[in-house]
Amino acid sequence: MRTLGVIALAGIGASVVCLAIAHAIDPGVDQFRGFRGDGFGFMFRGCSTPSDDSANITRELEWHGGDTVTINVPATIHYRPDNGPTLRASGPNDIMSHLRVRDGRVELDCRMYGFDRELNLVLPGRTFDSFILNGTGHLVLENLRQTELNVSLRGEGDVRATGMADDLTLNIAGSGDADMGQLSVQSSKVRIAGSGKAALAPRDSADIFIAGSGEIRFLEQPRHLQTHIAGSGRIINAPTTGL
């Protein structure tokens, strides 16, 4: 019994440490965060579960927010700098009526349970420096041309980016997957807490921290590399080219 108690306490301690590391890497991480994204979503009414034959509709919503976009709904999200000025959203009529944009957050005005159909979101073409994806979802960033790019995955979502950015900051808390191999960057700073994966190709420098079993694959080897790994995480260097 004493052994079982020690094991249980060790497990609890490890969980607390992991949560603390995740919060240190990305202060926005909150284990109680739901699709509302405010940390207290359990206090609000639930959405009605959409029927299987609920018709899809498309809505256009005015964008309210600055240079940070936070996605708190399960969705496939597309962004291009040449998109229009509004958020275009498609999905089941039963759910779309609850969709809101508040201070750069795309979320629902109710709690959603038992919903396995993703929404489709097309973000406005204004410049965003930061993209935050909470929970599940697919974030597609195309034809970027910007100085700074900050991407945070909290949960099990994934992101793919193409284009150019001078400086990339990538935070993954959970099991997210980031494909940045087709994004041309000078320098990158990557923080992974959990089992997340990332592929990237920084030309000049990379600062890497992994807590857990995360994995980073370099498609192009940076000239300057700084690493710290706590756990079973690993870094796969770019293959060397023979002369």
Where are the predicted features?
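Intrinsically disordered, low-complexity terminal regions
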Residues: 1-154, 158-163, 167-173, 177-182, ...
